[in-house]
């Protein structure tokens, strides 16, 4: 398929700017970087509860680190596979994907996502990656109705789960709750896919694909993940595979660094959960470097810890390979990046360490639970009387949606998911706390 079709935008542009010689993907990167949705990431913490000092990462600093790792992966692949240089394309494209990958995530992390998904259970559901696709293509006001109006290849790259939610949803056996405080995230996991409300944009992105490629790319299968009832997609584009690897590496390594600095993960936990597995790795580099990395990670000398973090990131980045799936015709689907098996196992061990000792930590789960209550309370209030409580511009979107017979509840999810953690908390206090003051400062923020 010609590269020009992947550089097309949904809405044609005739902007004539003096001496502007940027490539289409450089323009995409600029639009994302200067967007309000991207700026809001600075006020959404990467891991709830670790923000008690100024060292912690936000979703914005995380996205910047993912971008740096993503371009590092591309540079390594370009040297390792010179025949794939044309496919790797622009560094600005990969930066765009990495910078934008978390834009759709709501306040309060997974707690906010589950809460919105529950409140939207009869209206198409909610999921952070689906919301990212929606913001980029429809909501961000760079254009009147086409969002950031990004290139087709950029939109293909952001598709982590390329299928509409209606094809993926499997009804659970759990009854609906009678009280918001009873909501258990494990019983209401979001469907990982595109909202059906955005199926027209999804169709446009996939337009250049052959019938066979599209059918295979959007095919679904039962999930192998325990306690996840919904179906899962099977494939992603080449660009998306690089972005997802960069995200996984940043999550496993940099979030681990945060946890070590704050004393959440200890050297004894490392020796108990990581060392026994990795010392038997089939890769000699992992076996040889393990002890030194473990010692430096928990050193009181900051430069030694940073050296260990750099060694880990470099180890993963240089262990990425390109796989060929000849069942696809389109090169962007035929080729995917992945970690060598031993390094994939090592990365999973680190991710499980972060999940076990950080994400599942009761104090952090309490904050996530609190966020759930805030999000559900806000949604319930706005849904009860949208034309009374929503900001004027959101009221207008809600009315338009109602008049056109569209999903007006999606407008409520759009509004709440765009909030920062702090803004959502203040607005909740404004609505439900008798001691809250004027809402003048609230009206200025969104």
From Swiss-Prot:
Domain HD, first and last residues per copy: 59-252
GO annotation (BP), single: dGTP catabolic process
Key words, A-Z: Hydrolase
InterPro entries linked: dGTPase, dGTPase-like, dNTPase_2, HD/PDEase_dom, HD_domain, PHydrolase_assoc_dom
Keyword Cell inner membrane: no
GO molecular function, one term: dGTPase activity
Domain of life according to the entry: Bacteria
Region of interest: Disordered: 1-28
Family: Belongs to the dGTPase family. Type 2 subfamily.
Name assigned to this protein: Deoxyguanosinetriphosphate triphosphohydrolase-like protein
Protein source organism: Shewanella sp. (strain MR-7)
Species lineage: Bacteria, Pseudomonadati, Pseudomonadota, Gammaproteobacteria, Alteromonadales
């Amino acid at each position: 398929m010609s590269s020009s079709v992947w550089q097309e935008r949904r809405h044609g542009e005739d902007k004539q700017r003096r001496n502007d010689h940027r490539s289409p993907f450089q323009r995409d990167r600029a639009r994302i970087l200067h967007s309000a949705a991207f700026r809001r990431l600075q006020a959404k913490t990467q891991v709830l509860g670790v923000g008690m000092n100024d060292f912690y990462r936000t979703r914005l600093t995380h996205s910047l680190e993912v971008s740096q790792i993503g371009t590092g992966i591309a540079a390594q692949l370009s040297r390792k596979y010179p025949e794939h240089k044309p496919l790797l394309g622009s560094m600005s494209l990969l930066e765009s994907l990495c910078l934008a990958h978390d834009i759709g995530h709501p306040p309060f992390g997974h707690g906010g996502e589950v809460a919105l998904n529950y409140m939207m259970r009869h209206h198409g559901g909610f999921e952070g990656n689906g919301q990212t696709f929606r913001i980029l293509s429809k909501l961000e006001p760079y254009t009147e109705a086409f969002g950031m109006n990004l290139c087709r290849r950029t939109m293909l790259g952001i598709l982590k789960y390329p299928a509409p939610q209606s094809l993926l949803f499997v009804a659970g056996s759990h009854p609906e709750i009678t009280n918001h405080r009873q909501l258990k995230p494990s019983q209401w996991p979001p469907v990982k896919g595109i909202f059906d409300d955005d199926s027209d944009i999804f169709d446009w992105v996939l337009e250049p694909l052959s019938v066979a490629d599209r059918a295979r790319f959007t095919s679904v299968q039962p999930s192998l993940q325990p306690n996840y009832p919904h179906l899962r997609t099977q494939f992603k584009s080449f660009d998306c595979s690089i972005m997802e690897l960069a995200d996984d590496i940043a999550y496993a390594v940099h979030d681990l660094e945060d946890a070590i600095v704050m004393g959440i993960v200890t050297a004894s936990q490392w020796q108990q959960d990581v060392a026994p597995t990795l010392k038997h790795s089939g890769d000699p580099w992992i076996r040889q470097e393990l002890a030194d990395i473990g010692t430096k990670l928990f050193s009181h000398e900051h430069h030694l810890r940073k050296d260990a973090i750099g060694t880990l990131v470099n180890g993963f980045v240089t262990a990425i390979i390109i796989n060929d799936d000849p069942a696809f015709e389109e090169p962007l689907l035929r080729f995917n990046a992945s970690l060598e098996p031993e390094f994939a196992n090592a990365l999973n061990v680190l991710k499980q360490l972060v999940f076990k000792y950080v994400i599942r930590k009761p104090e952090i789960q309490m904050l996530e639970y609190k966020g759930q209550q805030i999000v559900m309370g806000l949604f319930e209030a706005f849904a009860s009387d949208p034309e009374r409580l929503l900001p004027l511009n959101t009221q207008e979107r809600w009315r338009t949606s109602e008049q056109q017979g569209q999903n007006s509840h999606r407008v409520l999810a759009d509004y709440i998911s765009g909030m920062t953690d702090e803004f959502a908390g203040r607005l909740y206090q404004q609505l439900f706390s008798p001691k809250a003051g004027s809402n003048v400062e609230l009206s200025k923020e969104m």
